[in-house]
Each structure stands twice: as C-alpha cells, then as structure tokens.
C-alpha cells in the first residue's frame, strides 16, 4: 500500500521511531541505503523558495542513488491549467516519489489521493513535518530518549511549525507546550488531535500565554520566524504582539541547565531570538539544519519500502 507523509501523525509512534533509527544509521553510514539506484527520479516541486529544503532533498535523493527533478510551479502547469490530481497521475508514470513545498494542505491531500507513488509534504501552511523529524533526531542526539522530555515552542502558535511540534512531539511521547498570545494559538482541531495521540503515548499538551511559565523546567526551547513568507505586510503588528516571546538568555535560564535551543532557520536575530542564544553554547541549530538531510533520506527509504 502506498504511504504518504503529509502530516506528522501519518506515522505511528513505532513508525516514527523506526524512521529516526534509520536516520541515525544513514548519518553514520551515509550511502548504506540506495533504493533509488538505477537511477530513479524523484520530483521535488517548489511553490515557495527554499535553501535548506531544496539542498537537503536534492543531496539526499542523490545519496540514495536517485536523480532529483526540481520543478517550480511558475514553470509548470500545476496550479494553472492542471489540477494537483492530474499532475500526480502524470508524474507517477515517470518518478518514484513526489516531494512538494506548497501553500494549501488540501493540494497535498488531492495529489496524494491521485497517485500511487509516495507524496511528501516538504512544507505547507498547516504543517512542516519533515522539519520536525529532523528536530526530533537532533533532540535525540543531544538529550537521549524523546519520551518524557518537555519541548516548548514560543511565538506564533498558529504556525505550521507549532502544529507539527504538537503532533510530532506527542507522537514521540513528549510533553509539548506552546507559548503564544491571544490570536496566535494553535488550531483547535490540531490541539484535539495532539491530545488524542498524547493519551496513548504518555505525552501531554499545554497551551500557555506566559513565556516564563512555559519555559520553566523545559528540556528543549524552540522558536521560529515571526514574519513568514507572504506576511511581510503584518511585520510591525507581529513584532509588537509577539515581542514578549523573544528567546533571551534570561528566558533560557528558566529551562533546565542543559536545555538546548532549536530554530528551523532562517532566523531574524533580535526579533524572535537574541543573538547570544542562537549563537551561544545551548544552540544546536547547525546540527538541526544538517539533520534535515539524514531525516528526509530515512523518510524516503521508509516510504519506498512500504510502497
């Protein structure tokens, strides 16, 4: 049966652990898996510009023996004359998998429903599951077993990153806290899904307004840009409303002594995070960026095995 990865909870707890174990192997033995040898082609479609996503998928597909076919929607029929479903049916005749960085989650769902090859969400407005796999790998490397650890995300709790931390974190059995002001809280349906998963994994979900309360006793502190692509006109308002959630050395002092700091990048220093934090000893953002490669390779290997 074809498996897709559109949301973090498309993997069960056991499957998520299996992918992370495989990522550890591939980081240690980079060319130990070659499921795309032939070579086979993987379509990598971009509606949004990217550095880390484009490089990590292109390099990862090549590492697995394949050829990355990078497509811009500006230079294709997708989203214009052709539906996502029709595009998927064309691509499946020629590629082994489809990776899509886009806007609407519904487009990914339509594409997945219309194809027999795996579809991977490389980012949507609602979720960023590949990033969370990389982050979980990074946390595991630096802090050991994921279950029982407390992960805090501060800032825009309605963002794709916050949604994915909720789902991916509780799938791993973590205690996930989102610290955000009114108007920036996660979607209720995502919170409900996370709570349902947490009830089976031993994790938990808390949505808080106070950043100090949220960070107190945390093992992992995370933030993301306050002004995402396409929201530049909201910059002044967002900086004013989210200013109290900046990750500073003073805020990090409320976490456990050996807490780590993550940020998926690109970062706006002195907005969502102080320079002394992201460039300081608790920051693991460069390991996190590298781990996009290993986590995504593991995901592709796993999906191709299932399919």
Curated annotation (Swiss-Prot):
The UniProt entry lists the main location of this chain as cytoplasm
Gene Ontology cellular component terms for the protein in this record: cytoplasm
What GO MF annotations does this protein's record show? amino acid binding; ornithine carbamoyltransferase activity
Catalytic reaction(s) noted: carbamoyl phosphate + L-ornithine = L-citrulline + phosphate + H(+)
Localization, UniProt? Cytoplasm
- Could you tell me which pathway this protein works in? Amino-acid biosynthesis; L-arginine biosynthesis; L-arginine from L-ornithine and carbamoyl phosphate: step 1/3
Tell me which UniProt keywords the record has, alphabetically: Amino-acid biosynthesis, Arginine biosynthesis, Cytoplasm, Transferase
Q: Which GO terms describe its biological process?
A: arginine biosynthetic process via ornithine; citrulline biosynthetic process; L-arginine biosynthetic process
Positions bound to carbamoyl phosphate: 50-53, 77, 101, 128-131, 264-265, 292
Question: PANTHER family, from UniProt?
Answer: ORNITHINE CARBAMOYLTRANSFERASE, MITOCHONDRIAL, ORNITHINE TRANSCARBAMYLASE, MITOCHONDRIAL
Which family does the record assign? Belongs to the aspartate/ornithine carbamoyltransferase superfamily. OTCase family.
Tell me, in a sentence or two, what this protein's role is: Reversibly catalyzes the transfer of the carbamoyl group from carbamoyl phosphate (CP) to the N(epsilon) atom of ornithine (ORN) to produce L-citrulline.
Quote the protein name from its UniProt record: Ornithine carbamoyltransferase
């Amino acid at each position: 049966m074809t498996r897709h990865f559109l949301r973090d909870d498309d993997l069960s707890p056991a499957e998520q652990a299996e992918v992370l174990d495989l990522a550890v192997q591939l980081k240690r033995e980079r060319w130990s898996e070659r499921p795309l040898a032939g070579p086979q082609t993987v379509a990598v479609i971009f509606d949004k510009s990217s550095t880390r996503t484009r490089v990590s998928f292109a390099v990862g597909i090549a590492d697995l023996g394949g050829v990355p076919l990078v497509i811009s929607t500006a230079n294709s029929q997708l989203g214009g004359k052709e539906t996502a479903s029709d595009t998927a049916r064309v691509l499946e005749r020629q590629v082994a998998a489809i990776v899509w960085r886009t806007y609407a989650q519904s487009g990914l769902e339509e594409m997945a429903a219309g194809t027999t090859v795996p579809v991977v969400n490389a980012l949507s407005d609602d979720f960023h599951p590949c990033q969370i796999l990389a982050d979980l790998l990074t946390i595991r490397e630096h802090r050991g077993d994921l279950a029982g650890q407390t992960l805090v995300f501060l800032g825009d709790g309605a963002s794709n990153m916050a949604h994915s931390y909720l789902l991916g974190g509780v799938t791993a059995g973590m205690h996930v806290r989102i610290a955000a002001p009114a108007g920036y809280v996660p979607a209720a349906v995502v919170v409900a899904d996370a709570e349902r998963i947490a009830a089976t994994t031993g994790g938990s979900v808390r949505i808080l307004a106070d950043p100090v309360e949220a960070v107190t006793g945390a093992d992992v502190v995370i933030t993301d840009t306050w002004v995402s692509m396409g929201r530049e006109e909201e910059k002044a308002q967002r900086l004013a409303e989210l200013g109290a959630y900046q990750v500073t050395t003073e805020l990090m002092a409320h976490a456990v002594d050996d807490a780590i700091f993550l940020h998926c990048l690109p970062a706006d220093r002195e907005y969502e995070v102080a320079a002394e934090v992201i460039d300081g000893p608790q920051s693991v953002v460069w390991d996190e960026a590298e781990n996009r490669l290993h986590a995504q390779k593991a995901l592709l290997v796993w999906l191709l095995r299932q399919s």
